[in-house]
Amino acid sequence: MNPSPLSSKNALITGASSGIGRAIALALAEHGVSTALLARRKERLEEVAEQTYKTGCRACIFVVDLSDPAETETAVSRAAEELGGIDILINAAGVALQSGLSNGEFEDWKTMMDINVLGLANVSRHALPHFPDSGGHILNLSSMSGHRVPGKGGFYAATKFAVRAMTEGLRQELRAAGSLTRVSSISPGFVDTELLDTYFANTDDRTSRYDRIGYPLLKPEEIAELVLHQLTLPATAEVTDILVRPTAQAT
């Protein structure tokens, strides 16, 4: 069996304790990637690290609140030192709250902005100096809500439109600087993760994720497969964004 083209690379993953971030961390480990796992919940991170060890790859965990700039900078620096550099950055951390623009809570808006936008930008800028001169890959988790605005999620959509803008903006900055580091994003529709529970927390609907939406959802592992596809493309190819939704999702 031929070794994976990702073998022996180092990846920093935010939001690695659950959902899509967790699935990506485990998929990368299966391909021989050493990982730095960043999230808020230590017990969850330890569980992901234990699963990673079973593949023979190493993982280090960092409990961090990405809304805290200094804490984030320290975590990224320590992760890069522990790994011996960063080849891949996966910005998978995110918060989804159904907080409207006309009647939403300011604290909800601030939480989404701090994690989805400022946290992502802060992790990226502190990780970049640790990338190899030959170039690495930054992959941001966006959303279908970064392409169209759902009726009750205007502010969340605004943060995901911002992720798309930052993805393209950073890509252009790096090209102008002569860097070959690729920058891309994935924009999923509904994925079967606890993020949906948070998104619907402000409603009276307490049914299951499936019953709430009414059709089979994407699985985190399916998003991880798309991540692997992007990361293993030839160095001369760069997919800027992938839109993926459940087959039954109309919009």
Listing of model-derived features with the role each one plays in the protein:
Residues 124, 159:
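Active-site helix of classical SDR
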Residues 17-18:
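Conserved glycine-rich cofactor-binding loop
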Residues 43, 63-74, 106:
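The beta1-alpha1 cofactor-binding region of Rossmann-like NAD(H)/NADP(H)-dependent oxidoreductases
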Residues 31-48:
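Conserved glycine-rich Rossmann-like NAD(P)H-binding loop of the short-chain dehydrogenase/reductase
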Residues 143:
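Residue(s) in the substrate-gating loop at a strand-loop-helix junction
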Residues 100-101, 105-111:
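Substrate-binding pocket helix/loop in short-chain dehydrogenase/reductase
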Residues 181, 185-186, 205-251:
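C-terminal helical subdomain
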